[in-house]
C-alpha cells in the first residue's frame, strides 16, 4: 500500500522532521484559501497521485498568483494525471497539495528499503537528488552511499554522520541530518514500511535541510496491526482489477503480456509465468486463486483476466493438493459457460484425481485444451495466443 505525499509529510512532521506548511485540498476554493492561510507570496501546488514524474506531466506548479492556483485546481481535480510511471489512463486526482515555496540551494536523496539480500533495512543517500535514483544506480552507482540497520541495535548516530560526511554536509547540517536519519529509521520500523524516499531532501538557501517530497510504501501484510496507516488507503489509486480481485481473496497483479494465467499457489504461479516466458510468451497477469479454488472464485478469476483486452489465451495451471482436480475441472467448465470465454483456454491439472479431472474436461464439449504437462501447457497456450 502506498501513501500520498501529503500523508507521508504528516508522518514526517509527527517525528519532528522539517517539512513545508501545506494543506491537501478537495476543491479549488479550498486551495485558494490554503494559500491565504499559509501566507507569503509564492506557493507550490501539486497533484496528489501514487506516481512519480508529476512535474514533467504538468502536475506541479510554482506560482505567486492565487487565481493561478484556482485554475490549476479546477483543471486537475476530477481528472487523471498521466506520467511515465502510470499506464495510458493515468491516476485520478482527488486532492491538490498547496505548500509554501522553499528556496533551494542543493538537492540530495535519502531513502530506505527492506533489502532481501541482507534481510535488513538499508538506507541510501546520494548527492544526486531530484532525479530518478534508479538511473543514478545504473549509471553512477558510486554516488549512492548506504547504511545497513542492525535490527538488534537499531539506527546509530555514527551511521548518520558517516552518510552526512559523504554528502559533504557542514557541522550544522550534520546535526539536522542525524535527526532526520534517526527519525526516519524509527518511523520505518514503527509503521512497517517497505519503502521510504525523500527525493529531494534539499539544502535551502539558508543552509538548512528540508524534506521537500515524500514517498512511502507499506508492507500490506502488516496492515492488520497498523490501523492508522490502513485508514490512509486511497482506493481510487488502486488498479481496478486488482481491487476487484481482492474482494474475492484473489491475488492479482496486472502485467503487459497477452497470456492470461490462473494458478493455485503463489510459487506455482511464478513458475508458470517463467515457463510461459521461456517458451516465447508474455504473461498478462499474475493470479493466484489460492487453495480453495471454488467454482465461484474461478469464475471471478476468468472475469478479471478477460477484462484485459490484451489477453489472447488463458492458461489454467492447478495442482490438486488441498482440492481435487475433478472438482476444479467442474469449476472451470461452469466458469467458462457462465463467463462466455471467447479465447482459447489451456488447462493443466496435476495431483489428486488429475486423470479424472482431465476426463471431465474432455467430455465437456467445450473448447478447452487439456495439457499433458506444464511444458505442453506453455507451448500450447503460447501458440494459441499467437493464433496458431
Swiss-Prot record:
Catalytic activity: succinate + ATP + CoA = succinyl-CoA + ADP + phosphate; GTP + succinate + CoA = succinyl-CoA + GDP + phosphate
Cofactors: Mg(2+)
Entry-linked Pfam families: ATP-grasp_2, Ligase_CoA
Pathway note: Carbohydrate metabolism; tricarboxylic acid cycle; succinate from succinyl-CoA (ligase route): step 1/1
Keyword Acyltransferase part of the UniProt annotation: no
Subunit organization: Heterotetramer of two alpha and two beta subunits.
PANTHER family hit by this protein: SUCCINATE--COA LIGASE [GDP-FORMING] SUBUNIT BETA, MITOCHONDRIAL, SUCCINYL-COA SYNTHETASE BETA CHAIN
Family matches, as HAMAP family: Succ_CoA_beta
Protein's name according to its UniProt entry: Succinate--CoA ligase [ADP-forming] subunit beta
Organism expressing this protein natively: Shewanella baltica (strain OS155 / ATCC BAA-1091)
Amino acid at each position: 500500500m502506498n501513501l500520498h505525499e501529503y500523508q507521508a509529510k504528516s508522518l514526517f512532521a509527527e517525528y519532528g522532521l522539517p517539512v513545508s506548511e501545506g494543506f491537501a485540498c478537495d476543491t479549488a476554493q479550498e486551495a485558494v484559501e490554503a494559500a491565504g492561510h499559509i501566507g507569503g507570496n509564492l506557493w507550490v501546488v501539486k497533484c496528489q497521485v501514487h506516481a512519480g514524474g508529476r512535474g514533467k506531466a504538468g502536475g506541479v506548479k510554482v506560482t505567486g498568483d492565487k487565481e493561478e492556483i484556482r485554475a490549476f485546481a479546477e483543471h486537475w481535480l476530477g481528472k487523471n494525471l498521466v506520467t511515465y510511471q502510470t499506464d495510458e489512463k493515468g491516476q485520478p486526482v482527488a486532492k491538490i497539495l498547496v505548500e509554501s515555496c522553499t528556496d533551494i540551494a542543493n538537492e540530495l536523496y535519502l531513502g530506505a528499503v527492506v533489502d532481501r539480500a541482507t534481510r535488513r533495512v538499508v538506507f541510501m543517500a546520494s548527492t544526486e537528488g531530484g532525479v530518478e535514483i534508479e538511473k543514478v544506480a545504473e549509471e553512477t552507482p558510486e554516488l549512492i552511499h548506504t547504511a545497513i540497520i542492525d535490527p538488534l541495535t537499531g539506527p546509530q548516530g555514527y551511521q548518520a554522520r558517516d552518510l552526512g560526511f559523504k554528502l559533504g554536509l557542514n557541522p550544522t547540517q550534520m546535526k539536522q541530518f542525524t535527526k532526520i536519519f534517526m527519525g526516519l529509521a524509527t518511523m520505518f520500523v514503527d509503521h512497517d514500511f517497505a519503502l521510504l524516499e525523500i527525493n529531494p531532501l534539499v539544502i535551502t538557501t539558508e543552509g538548512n535541510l528540508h524534506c521537500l517530497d515524500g514517498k512511502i510504501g507499506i508492507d500490506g501484510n502488516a496492515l492488520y496491526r497498523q490501523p492508522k496507516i490502513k485508514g490512509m488507503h486511497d482506493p481510487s489509486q488502486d488498479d481496478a482489477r486488482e481491487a476487484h480481485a481482492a474482494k474475492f481473496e484473489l491475488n492479482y497483479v496486472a502485467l503487459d503480456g497477452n497470456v492470461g494465467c490462473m494458478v493455485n499457489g503463489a510459487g506455482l504461479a511464478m513458475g508458470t509465468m517463467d515457463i510461459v516466458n521461456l517458451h516465447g510468451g508474455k504473461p498478462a497477469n499474475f493470479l493466484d486463486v489460492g487453495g480453495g479454488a471454488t467454482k465461484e472464485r474461478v469464475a471471478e478469476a476468468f472475469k478479471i483476466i478477460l477484462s484485459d483486452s490484451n489477453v489472447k489465451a488463458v492458461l489454467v495451471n492447478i495442482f490438486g493438493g488441498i482440492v481435487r482436480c475433478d472438482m476444479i475441472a467442474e469449476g472451470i467448465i461452469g466458469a467458462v459457460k457462465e463467463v462466455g470465454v471467447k479465447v482459447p483456454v489451456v488447462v493443466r491439472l496435476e495431483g489428486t484425481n488429475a486423470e479424472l479431472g482431465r476426463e471431465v474436461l474432455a467430455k465437456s464439449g467445450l473448447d478447452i485444451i487439456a495439457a499433458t504437462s506444464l511444458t505442453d501447457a506453455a507451448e500450447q497456450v503460447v501458440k494459441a495466443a499467437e493464433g496458431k
